[in-house]
């Protein structure tokens, strides 16, 4: 389900938690409702994920919306991102996300228009990584601005963005052939990955 607010956080436990013999649960997830989607990772888990070049954590750190944070801690964590970022893993992550979202959301003759962005964003992120630009920006507007696209395709995306802002998140409409053609081409192209550094 979709929610109005996605809340992501990192947390620490009291010292006793870290001295346990067994490995306790290191994730907090609350049931999703219409307003909130809340989940967080324990600090040590987050550091391990960063070391493993986890793109999801890297996106969390680049979120344009921050409700609360410890500036010094987050600044230090962000400074580690270039050290651990893996173009190969990021490309695979975004390509897989685009495939999954396309199959899950854009197969009917009528589709929920905002779901196009669930596919376009990871596909543009794949292009960003393949171009050697480093970590893809979280903001779709920055990702779009840094992408070289056919003028007609860019106009179609811009029009869809305007329509989404006017009509809201839930609007349905007929599938868009130009966008579908681009998505199909990018997914087919992505099956043969380029050589990227690990």
Stretches with model-predicted labels:
Residues 53-78, 85-94:
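Short secondary-structure capping/junction motifs at helix and strand boundaries
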């Amino acid at each position: 389900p979709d929610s109005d607010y996605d809340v992501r956080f990192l947390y620490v436990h009291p010292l006793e938690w870290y001295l346990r013999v067994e490995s306790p649960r290191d994730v907090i997830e609350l049931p999703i409702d219409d307003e909130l989607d809340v989940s967080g990772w324990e600090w040590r888990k987050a550091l391990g994920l960063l070391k493993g070049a986890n793109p999801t954590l890297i996106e969390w750190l680049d979120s344009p919306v921050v409700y609360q944070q410890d500036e010094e801690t987050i600044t230090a964590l962000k400074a580690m991102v270039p050290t651990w970022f893996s173009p190969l893993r990021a490309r695979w992550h975004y390509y897989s996300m685009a495939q999954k979202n396309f199959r899950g959301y854009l197969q009917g003759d009528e589709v929920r228009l905002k779901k196009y962005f669930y596919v376009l964003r990871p596909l543009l992120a794949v292009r960003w990584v393949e171009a050697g630009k480093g970590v893809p920006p979280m903001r779709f507007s920055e990702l779009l601005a840094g992408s070289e696209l056919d003028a007609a395709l860019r106009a179609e995306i811009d029009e869809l963005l305007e329509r989404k802002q006017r009509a809201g998140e839930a609007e349905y409409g007929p599938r868009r052939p130009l966008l579908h053609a681009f998505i199909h081409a990018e997914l087919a192209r992505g099956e043969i990955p380029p050589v990227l550094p690990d």
